[in-house]
């Protein structure tokens, strides 16, 4: 099977790269094992929240300039501030075209409220998520009886520290009792599958309506809206106060929705989606990828003109830690890491951890190297890259988006030259 590009990994980076390549008229396939890290995320995307020295970033342009001085090997630093902002804006346009109407500005971060009621600087958020400063003084944090994925009293306690009048309440929906037989089934995603049924909308409205008459804003867990935000808009039009939603413990309704919107758009535009499959081997000839072998296709290889590695970091098994060191399991690419295991981590758990910055070594075009030699038609994007800390620096989603589009543009340019 021949393709212009085969992308190994179907997370945020892989999907955005595929969508951008389709804009250039290239035929793409994505090979993915299963759920991506988006399923376990908040659904919000960070661009740059803090510098390596811990300084918070509010002005993104100034932050990118400072980042280049502090971390010259960061994926952003390799591109330059203006290029990062341009690619981030293009990524936001792609996301919106896919149906993910996310709120945010590439020039200025905003503060979203977290499930614990604290604030986190971010780039893009779903319109349901409350953004600081809140537009209300009287707030009610509403939990769902029996839902362990969200603790209303913890969020309320944090918000009270910001001089807000915050109460808590709990709604009980007997229609959800079918899920209570097994506590592991009473999760936000399973609740959403029931509540998203239009026949159940009125039941949720009836439960929230008495609470809404006594406050200016309801904050509740995101336990509906798995496919779209239609129910949230329907409730907001009818309730006498604003309704906002907070992400829950994983799996996350907002994260799954974002992934599904991107995946459906990729397929709608003619992309080949290969779920439940896994790349087992990649054949390289004369420094280029010639064949990709997957588990499900056995002796039928995929033959791409270009290949993209978007396999993620440790969480997605894109990187594997062993006693001898860190390795990239598909091709055995060169990996940036510390010399000894003792340098992988810091003693204090909440300190920035060195292992977060491990990843494959690439050139400035994000082409990785194998035994010191660049693989000419292979690109590495997203969390598998080295040189950044997605947690401490708050840049995970941004690096995925920016590197994906940079690789896509580079591939499209080279593909045009080869025609």
Swiss-Prot record:
Annotated membrane topology: Peripheral membrane protein
Q: Name one GO molecular function term.
A: glycerol-3-phosphate dehydrogenase (quinone) activity
Which family is this protein grouped under? Answer: Belongs to the anaerobic G-3-P dehydrogenase subunit B family.
Instruction: Quickly give the catalysed reaction.
Output: a quinone + sn-glycerol 3-phosphate = dihydroxyacetone phosphate + a quinol
Give yes or no: UniProt keyword Lipid biosynthesis.
no
Tell me the Pfam families matching this sequence. FAD_binding_2 (PF00890)
Q: What is this protein called?
A: Anaerobic glycerol-3-phosphate dehydrogenase subunit B
Q: Which gene encodes it?
A: glpB
Q: How does it assemble?
A: Composed of a catalytic GlpA/B dimer and of membrane bound GlpC.
GO annotation, cellular component aspect: glycerol-3-phosphate dehydrogenase (FAD) complex; plasma membrane
Biological process (GO) annotations held by this record are: glycerol catabolic process
């Amino acid at each position: 099977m021949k393709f212009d590009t085969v992308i190994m990994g179907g997370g945020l980076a892989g999907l955005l790269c595929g969508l951008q390549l389709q804009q250039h008229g290239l035929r793409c396939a994505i090979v993915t094992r299963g759920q991506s890290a988006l399923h376990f995320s908040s659904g919000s995307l960070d661009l740059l929240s803090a510098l390596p020295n811990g300084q918070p970033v509010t002005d993104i342009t100034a932050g990118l300039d400072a980042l280049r001085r502090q971390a010259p090997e960061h994926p952003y630093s390799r591109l330059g501030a203006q290029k990062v902002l341009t690619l981030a804006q293009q990524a936001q346009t792609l996301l919106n075209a896919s149906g993910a109407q996310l709120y945010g500005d590439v020039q200025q971060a905003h503060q979203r409220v977290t499930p614990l009621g604290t604030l986190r600087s971010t780039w893009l958020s779903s319109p349901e998520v409350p953004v600081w400063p809140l537009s209300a003084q009287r707030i009610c944090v509403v939990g769902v009886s029996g839902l362990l994925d969200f603790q209303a009293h913890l969020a309320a306690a944090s918000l009270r520290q910001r001089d807000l009048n915050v109460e808590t309440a709990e709604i009980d929906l007997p229609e959800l009792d079918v899920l209570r037989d097994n506590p592991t089934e009473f999760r936000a995603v399973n609740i959403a599958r029931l509540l998203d049924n239009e026949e159940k909308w009125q039941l949720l409205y009836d439960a929230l309506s008495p609470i809404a008459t006594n406050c200016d804003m309801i904050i509740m867990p995101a336990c509906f809206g798995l496919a779209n935000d239609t129910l949230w808009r329907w409730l907001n039009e009818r309730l006498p106060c604003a309704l906002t939603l907070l992400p829950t413990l994983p799996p996350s309704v907002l994260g799954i929705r974002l992934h599904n919107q991107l995946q459906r758009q990729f397929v709608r535009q003619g992309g080949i989606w290969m779920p439940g499959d896994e790349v087992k081997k990649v054949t390289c000839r004369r420094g280029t990828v010639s064949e990709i072998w997957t588990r499900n296709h056995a002796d039928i290889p995929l033959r791409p003109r270009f290949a993209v590695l978007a396999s993620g970091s440790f969480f997605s098994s894109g990187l594997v830690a062993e006693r001898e060191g860190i390795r990239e399991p598909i091709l055995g690419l060169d990996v940036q890491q510390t010399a000894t295991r003792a340098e992988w981590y810091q003693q204090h758990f909440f300190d920035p951890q060195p292992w977060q910055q491990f990843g494959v070594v690439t050139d400035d075009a994000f082409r990785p190297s194998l035994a010191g030699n660049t693989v000419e038609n292979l690109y590495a994007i997203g969390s598998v890259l080295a040189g950044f800390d997605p947690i401490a620096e708050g840049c995970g989603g941004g690096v995925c988006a920016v590197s994906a589009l940079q690789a896509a543009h580079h591939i499209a340019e080279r593909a045009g030259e080869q025609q």
